[in-house]
Amino acid sequence: MRKIQRITQFSDDNNRSQREHIPLDLIVEIVSSLPAKSIVRFRSVSKLWSSIITTPDFTSSVVTRSLSSRPCVLLIFQKHDKLFFFASPVHQKKTCPNVENFQYTIPNNGKLQRCESVHGLIYLETSTNVMFIRNPITKSFFTLPKLDSKEGRPLTGFLGYDPINGKYKVLCILKERNKIGILTLGAQESWRILSKGFLSHYKVTGYAKCIDGVIYYEGSFGDGLRQELAIMSFDLRSEKFSLIKHPKKSSIATCWSSYEGRLALVSSIASGVSLWILEDADNHKQWIYKHFPSHREFIKERWKLKGVTRTGEFIYTSYRAYVLNVEGRVLYQWFRILYVDPKRNSMRVVMHGGIAVDDIRRLDEVGYDLMKDLTVIPNHIQI
């Protein structure tokens, strides 16, 4: 067991000093049980404490403790190279005056390409092929190391979490069809390149989801002229790939989600919401189809499907960045999220205040479609 030493000096006849040993495991246990704001302050105690707090293993342990708390919906507005993040509580009353928020500016005038939340970490991928991760403990972003240029250019990346070993890994698809990079966070953080054990990647759509230690992503795979749209699964623990037959011949999803602990391809159509749910029946991957009719509220106003909560509620945002009051006046003070429970045939609207009000007003007045670049991430673990 690693130990750190604290020197306690006292006066006696021989001016002796006594060394007291504090087990490192005990320090980790104590600090990880503190509130996030207190943990950040402990970074200044010593270099050792700072190194402990910023490790992925420590982050994983803190996030795991937070799993019992209610998740939130992460809203990300994009204004040029600036990102505005807002954490919206899922189980909230009709109005929520304030939400936790923060901002981030993408370096080199880049644009947001992909964003996902996996076990508390936020993964960002930009148009300049740079990958960032936000540490929920330190509240700061850090850049992932670049791949060696001789291995090829990154096409896209996916963040995953292995709950068995408590490890975060990034899977990077390279433009060279027979190469894939793997980065284990905290393990010297250097890329490993795989060149076998999987089919050639001809195209990756960007749809992806990490569920129970497995990353699922969509693309065109095959050898030579034989290419087909399919879903690739990557087991983060064994680092093995498996090809799963696609339920349809073309990409059908509005979004991907974890539905009752299983991968679901969710589509919003005029008649309602359709789900293709992956069922592991004796390891023979099968798809189950479910359809939920549209709720009556959709007759009055247009809403856009953005995801599914842990409890199976559908998450919608309005096509408009403002609210009309009873007199028909435009109000920018509130942003609305609609939750629809298809099993109970019920719905609720939560109105949030303080969400980029000035930016929404200015951009809307000049015709800038702020809602077009809105990213919504369900089931984010807020620490």
From Swiss-Prot:
SUPFAM superfamilies: F-box domain (SSF81383). This is Putative F-box protein At4g09190. Pfam families: F-box, FBA_3. Residues 16-67 form the F-box domain.
